[in-house]
Amino acid sequence: MNSPSRPLADRRLTDRLFALALQKNDLPFEISVTGGSMSPSLKDGDCVAVRREDAYLPGDIVVFRQNGGLTVHRLLWQAGGRAVCKGDSNLFREEVSAEDILGKVIAVSCGDVTFSPISGQLLAALSYEKLLIFKAHGEDRQATRRDPAYLEIQHFLHGLRYSLTNEGTKR
């Protein structure tokens, strides 16, 4: 009996295998975003073009191997063969091996609109600020989400996503 989630699992496996094959040959590849951890920069269903780079900078949106799958998050910093990444809307960050980074997002397609990621440094700073607010509230998600500074950052990010999407449709 097929479960309803099987097609999604098949798509993830296909994306992962295809991405790994292209990455080994240093070719750009595309994958579909699933989930909301990168909202508002990326949303569920967006397609991202990814290219391997010699070096990655804080603020870059990167794709890395994690728990047998691929994850798309923002790079906060990298040192000593380790990288710290975080989804823009996540409260937690994760440490990954720099070897597991497959590439950097170079373009995003949402529907008929394609655009390049905006200032990664700005978004990394805002994402880090959200993390600091979360830590200040003792890692209490509910208290964090009620914090005026957190709400202001969220409002700004959602407005930015809306603005970028509407600008792209005018092209």
Describe the residue ranges of each PLM region.
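Extended hydrophobic leader/signal-anchor segments used for secretion and membrane insertion
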Residues: M1-R171
